[in-house]
Amino acid sequence: MSKDDVIEVEGTVVEPLPNAMFRVELDNGHKVLAHVSGKIRMNFIRILPGDRVTVELSPYDLTRGRIIYRHK
Protein backbone atom coordinates (compact mmCIF):
# COMPACT_ATOMS: atom_id res chain seq x y z
CA MET A 1 0.00 0.00 0.00
CA SER A 2 1.45 3.35 -1.00
CA LYS A 3 1.07 6.65 0.79
CA ASP A 4 -1.47 7.75 -1.84
CA ASP A 5 -3.93 5.08 -0.67
CA VAL A 6 -4.40 6.47 2.85
CA ILE A 7 -7.33 8.62 3.97
CA GLU A 8 -6.53 11.68 6.10
CA VAL A 9 -9.29 13.00 8.38
CA GLU A 10 -9.43 15.32 11.37
CA GLY A 11 -10.88 14.50 14.75
CA THR A 12 -10.81 15.06 18.49
CA VAL A 13 -9.14 12.80 21.05
CA VAL A 14 -11.83 11.40 23.35
CA GLU A 15 -9.85 9.18 25.73
CA PRO A 16 -6.32 7.86 26.16
CA LEU A 17 -5.82 4.09 26.21
CA PRO A 18 -2.82 1.97 27.22
CA ASN A 19 0.21 1.56 24.94
CA ALA A 20 0.01 5.01 23.28
CA MET A 21 -3.43 4.28 21.83
CA PHE A 22 -6.25 6.81 21.73
CA ARG A 23 -9.97 6.79 21.00
CA VAL A 24 -10.55 9.55 18.44
CA GLU A 25 -13.93 10.91 17.35
CA LEU A 26 -13.76 12.01 13.73
CA ASP A 27 -15.56 15.06 12.37
CA ASN A 28 -18.13 12.80 10.69
CA GLY A 29 -19.09 11.24 14.05
CA HIS A 30 -17.27 7.90 13.76
CA LYS A 31 -14.97 6.76 16.57
CA VAL A 32 -11.68 5.07 15.67
CA LEU A 33 -8.80 3.52 17.59
CA ALA A 34 -5.59 5.38 16.76
CA HIS A 35 -1.95 4.94 17.70
CA VAL A 36 0.79 7.58 17.66
CA SER A 37 3.11 7.80 14.66
CA GLY A 38 6.84 7.39 15.13
CA LYS A 39 7.78 11.03 14.51
CA ILE A 40 5.33 12.27 17.16
CA ARG A 41 6.69 9.65 19.57
CA MET A 42 10.34 10.56 18.85
CA ASN A 43 9.72 14.29 19.40
CA PHE A 44 7.88 13.66 22.71
CA ILE A 45 4.71 15.47 21.59
CA ARG A 46 2.05 14.96 24.25
CA ILE A 47 -1.48 14.18 23.16
CA LEU A 48 -4.25 14.86 25.68
CA PRO A 49 -8.04 14.38 25.58
CA GLY A 50 -9.66 17.26 23.72
CA ASP A 51 -6.74 17.80 21.31
CA ARG A 52 -7.50 18.23 17.61
CA VAL A 53 -5.51 15.70 15.58
CA THR A 54 -5.11 14.53 12.00
CA VAL A 55 -5.60 10.78 11.64
CA GLU A 56 -4.42 8.62 8.74
CA LEU A 57 -6.77 5.70 7.97
CA SER A 58 -6.17 2.66 5.80
CA PRO A 59 -8.88 2.00 3.21
CA TYR A 60 -8.86 -1.66 4.30
CA ASP A 61 -9.71 -1.07 7.98
CA LEU A 62 -11.55 2.17 8.72
CA THR A 63 -11.78 1.46 12.48
CA ARG A 64 -8.04 1.88 13.15
CA GLY A 65 -5.69 4.72 12.33
CA ARG A 66 -2.45 6.54 13.01
CA ILE A 67 -2.22 10.03 14.56
CA ILE A 68 0.13 11.97 12.31
CA TYR A 69 -0.36 15.58 13.52
CA ARG A 70 -1.56 17.41 16.63
CA HIS A 71 -3.07 20.80 15.82
CA LYS A 72 -2.01 23.78 17.90
From Swiss-Prot:
Location of the protein in the cell: Cytoplasm
Pfam family, one: eIF-1a
Keyword Protease: no
Coiled-coil regions listed: none
Keyword Cytoplasm: yes
SS bond list: none
UniProt superkingdom: Bacteria
Domain S1-like residues, every copy: 1-72
MF (Gene Ontology): ribosome binding; rRNA binding; translation initiation factor activity
An example Gene Ontology CC term for this record: cytosol
Keyword field: Cytoplasm, Initiation factor, Protein biosynthesis, RNA-binding, rRNA-binding
Record's function text: One of the essential components for the initiation of protein synthesis. Stabilizes the binding of IF-2 and IF-3 on the 30S subunit to which N-formylmethionyl-tRNA(fMet) subsequently binds. Helps modulate mRNA selection, yielding the 30S pre-initiation complex (PIC). Upon addition of the 50S ribosomal subunit IF-1, IF-2 and IF-3 are released leaving the mature 70S translation initiation complex.
Xref: PANTHER family: TRANSLATION INITIATION FACTOR IF-1, CHLOROPLASTIC
HAMAP family listed in its UniProt record: IF_1
Assembly notes: Component of the 30S ribosomal translation pre-initiation complex which assembles on the 30S ribosome in the order IF-2 and IF-3, IF-1 and N-formylmethionyl-tRNA(fMet); mRNA recruitment can occur at any time during PIC assembly.
Family classification: Belongs to the IF-1 family.
Name assigned to this protein: Translation initiation factor IF-1
Gene name for this UniProt entry: infA
